[in-house]
Swiss-Prot record:
This is Pi-hexatoxin-Hi1d. The keyword Amino-acid biosynthesis does not apply. Expressed by the venom gland. It comes from Hadronyche infensa (Fraser island funnel-web spider). Residues 3-71 are annotated as: 2 X approximate repeats with cysteine pattern C-C-CC-C-C. The presence of a 'disulfide through disulfide knot' structurally defines this protein as a knottin. This toxin contains 2 'disulfide through disulfide knots' that are separated by a short linker. It comes from the Eukaryota.
């Protein structure tokens, strides 16, 4: 089962948000996966669709072929 990405609904799937995200009930709205404050993706973690979530000193690197992007040291 794919994890739920940032800003997508997590109604009935509270524990399925992607790493570093938590299910949050917005006022006057439904529950969505939001970033956990202070969390960042460490080196070699997948960052597809989460380019700004890599930790300091890392950037989301698009690997060749159909491989997923990962957080890698800034060259």
């Amino acid at each position: 089962n794919e994890c739920i990405r940032k800003w997508l609904s997590c109604v009935d799937r509270k524990n399925d948000c992607c790493e570093g995200l938590e299910c949050y009930k917005r006022r006057h709205s439904f529950e969505v996966c939001v970033p956990i404050p202070g969390f960042c993706l460490v080196k070699w973690k997948q960052c597809d669709g989460r380019e700004r979530d890599c930790c300091a000193g890392l950037e989301c690197w698009k690997r060749s072929g159909n491989k997923s992007s990962v957080c890698a040291p800034i060259a």
